[in-house]
């Protein structure tokens, strides 16, 4: 697990591997990072297993012995939150912040969503054993926010903003304002096909969130996405994710308007701009089908 530093800033990050979480990558498929200040460390996301969270904590301790002041969670998906357990057990249980919809996922307001979390945990206990096992549990947020959270630690200003529902209902980004660094969570997938194949995904709102990122002034100088490599060209990273979503939506919109079946629509769509990207084989067809259903429901009033 290699630790990277943003040039000229006390901002550090870890990059996950391509592919779906499994034994070959030990669940390390997402990105996470942290910011060192004079008054403590601010962590963004915690990786996908307690073991990975502990290794992340070790990397933090290689840089600083400052306490973990707080953890910001981009969204409550397994590959970003199971590492919270390591911080709970080995870093003094620092406060965890997330957008308020996270409470539903952990069972705080919706039994069905709490059951979803338990089903995912059961699946990961099988797919990622022994890195996720019977001792693994979901750490709930200690604090939540609705739309926006601003705070300061050690003279560094932070902005956390909810951009969901997009990839997930609670999708949130964190801007380290003093250093022009953006942690985008899964609103941005860099250099690979995004994951849209979820009933929670709202592709129209996702595009609105990407438009918000392009409107930031001053524009960020560095972006750390939820998946894929970090980039010193945030505009390009935003554009790549946005162009893919727009392309899939337009292709499926035309298909719905022409009363085509999904199989017909998928077969006649030119995917050549994307078929070389990591995760294309694993995700693209499911992405297109999810958007097809979304637009079909919007057009014909389905559920």
What are these regions (language model features)?
Residues 10, 35, 45, 60, ...:
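Divalent metal-coordination and catalytic microenvironments
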Residues 44-46, 69-77, 97-99, 163, ...:
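Active-site neighborhood of phospho(di)ester-bond hydrolases with catalytic His/Asp-centered motifs
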Residues 53, 58-143, 150, 169-171:
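Active-site HxH/HxHxD metal-binding segment of metal-dependent hydrolases
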Residues 144-176:
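Core dinuclear metal-dependent hydrolase active-site scaffold
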Residues 181, 203-260, 264:
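Divalent-metal (often Zn2+) His-rich catalytic cores of metallo-beta-lactamase-fold enzymes
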Residues 257-303:
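C-terminal regulatory/interaction regions
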